[in-house]
Amino acid sequence: MTRYIFITGGVVSSLGKGLASAALGALLQARGYKVRLRKLDPYLNVDPGTMSPYQHGEVFVTDDGAETDLDLGHYERFTGVSATKADNITTGQIYKTIIEKERRGDYLGATVQVIPHVTNEIKDFVLSPAMDETGEKAVDFVLVEIGGTVGDIEGLPFFEAIRQLRQDLPRGQSCYVHLTLLPFIKTAGEMKTKPTQHSVKELRSIGIQPDILLCRCEQEIPPEEKRKIAQFCNVRPSAVIQAMDSSSIYAVPIDYHEQGLDAEVLDVFGMRDAPAPDLTRWKTIDDTVQHPDGEVTIAVVGKYTVLKDAYKSLIEALHHGGLANKVKVNLDWVESETFEGDEGAAAARLENAHAIMVPGGFGERGAEGKIRAAQFARERKVPYFGICFGMQMAVIETLRNVAGIKDASSSEFGPTERPVVGIMTEWIKGNETVQRRANDDLGGTMRLGAYDAVLTAGSKIAEIYGATEISERHRHRYEVNIGYVHLMEDAGLKLTGRSPNGVLPEIVERDDHPWFIGVQYHPELKSRPFAPHPLFASFIAAAKEHGRLV
């Protein structure tokens, strides 16, 4: 029997519902249960693929090619369960489906309304088969996070749907967890419970009585305040769970367990004889974070650096590399435009970095700065890791400054006589050929999801992976032009990874450099704290070695 846990938020956004959902999933896993996490996003976009990173943050890509919310990255990293298209839905997708059904005549002339048609689509999504990773057995728990906060007009159909689900499901098969804020007013020296009371009042006004309150706070909640919250919010005092800031995000499962979150959830389901959790691996990770053997500084040269959520998976993957090497990873965020128009700016800013990371991105803005970062890394023998756009800029840098093709560029930046990087028009997906054109819609038209690659035997990349065949996740529309590979290799940048049909360049590396690798895919999307991606583990090891040498 599958049980459902609905996680909602109140008072303000960005309290950490995604992290709380992921941590609760990890705690249930630690007790031996199978879990799957899903996200309901109330915005009207079909997916976040065309949304600005400044507004939405990172777009997390699944193996099956879904462009999803960054919270699915938290889910994967904390549970190790790979998300799919079936784990994220938006209002845009729901309305698109309903309108298509109406045009086909599926509703048999009925007036199409929010209730029941929209709410039924939401319920069907929530209740769709949730299988474990073998695909053979249903999971024990489905955790469903509702985006936004209670009271948002966009979220009303979702709250109505989960209200109905409590009645639709057998008794004792659902649980509501509400994440809220307990602000501490320093001038008054008091913790204020009124925002939480009003948030729960709003939730109850639409027919949802939370079973558990997860209260974000800066200080410990005094017992009398817990009793007050419980009384006014109609929950047991034991169901008022304190959620203070943790020393690191990987300490969150431990902290929530100590506060009794998982035990309280299981009590709601009447599962009082559940196995005790095994939190050994989380304690090991937290101990490594708290007691590193050293530090390294990684310069991250990007264009969305003012909003760190735009690089959420990348940040975590770099820290996973630190865990693998038992070092603390300090990130020096460098706006790539800083280097444009100033020859010495790159050298001055990157001088103290132990390694340089140039992550993915889109568009011409900041591109020249990334090219200069790649040049600095190549000339100074500083470890360099280019991901997606970062690989493309490394190729352009080599062809400009080593091969002497001064006008080498990307067709993404406009018409060019030397399209070293060009738009992809055709590639293989499974057994089918996918075709795209420059004037296609932007949404959902990139090369998305997991693709295989073949690595050159004896190359550094093959040594790092310990294999010559790999599968990684992609999200890109442009690719290194295969017609320039011979010039690139003559200039010292070797192509050591291709698509299985040999047409698409996937990986480049320099054999005259301690660690200089560019990959067209996004390895950060598959890294886990308890299974760091080998590329990030190797990159941080190279940074550690470079730091020792300098």
From Swiss-Prot:
Mg(2+) binds at residues 71, 145. Residues 297-549 form the Glutamine amidotransferase type-1 domain. One of its GO terms (biological process) is 'de novo' CTP biosynthetic process. Keywords: ATP-binding, Glutamine amidotransferase, Ligase, Magnesium, Metal-binding, Nucleotide-binding, Pyrimidine biosynthesis. UTP binds at residues 13, 192-197, 228. The active site is at residues 388, 522, 524. Residues 1-271 are annotated as: Amidoligase domain. GO terms for molecular function: ATP binding; CTP synthase activity; glutaminase activity; identical protein binding; metal ion binding. Its EC number is 6.3.4.2. It catalyses: UTP + L-glutamine + ATP + H2O = CTP + L-glutamate + ADP + phosphate + 2 H(+); L-glutamine + H2O = L-glutamate + NH4(+); UTP + NH4(+) + ATP = CTP + ADP + phosphate + 2 H(+). Allosterically activated by GTP, when glutamine is the substrate; GTP has no effect on the reaction when ammonia is the substrate. The allosteric effector GTP functions by stabilizing the protein conformation that binds the tetrahedral intermediate(s) formed during glutamine hydrolysis. Inhibited by the product CTP, via allosteric rather than competitive inhibition. The keyword Repeat does not apply. Pathway: Pyrimidine metabolism; CTP biosynthesis via de novo pathway; CTP from UDP: step 2/2. It comes from the Bacteria. The keyword Acetylation does not apply. ATP binds at residues 14-19, 71. Belongs to the CTP synthase family. Catalyzes the ATP-dependent amination of UTP to CTP with either L-glutamine or ammonia as the source of nitrogen. Regulates intracellular CTP levels through interactions with the four ribonucleotide triphosphates. Homotetramer. This is CTP synthase. It comes from Caulobacter vibrioides (strain NA1000 / CB15N) (Caulobacter crescentus).
